[in-house]
Amino acid sequence: MTDIKTALAGLSETAAIQYLTEQFPGAVAFSTSFGQEDQVLADMIWRNKLPVRVFTLDTGRLFQETYELMDLTRARYKQPFETYFPETAAMEKLVAEKGFNSFYDSVENRKECCFIRKRQAHRMAPGRRMEPGQPRPAFRRRQREV
């Protein structure tokens, strides 16, 4: 990790992503939620023709506006992105046992719901801001998702 951190120091975002695609050919993926930061990163990937797989997670809880933006993005860039869905059987079991909104009831239920609804990539470049949401004092430009 230190070697990568050293190699990426001082590189632009585009150059950093290019470096990662060279170090991990075919294994770099970008997870987009279609937020502003994610749209900027997707634009950077597609405009520079970086060999990064772009994907999104449809958790079944997205706003209609998100679906509309997905369609607009697909039409504008004419680039593929994969859409992943939760495993049907696990989702059906969760809803049957705990209802549609169990994640509001407890932290444990929230973690269970997120575990069922979300997927992980081998290497992920999530678009995140440093300032909003929970404090991120240790937020790094690059980090490994586990």
Residue ranges and their predicted role:
Residues 1-146:
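ATP-dependent adenylation/nucleotidyltransferase module used to activate substrates
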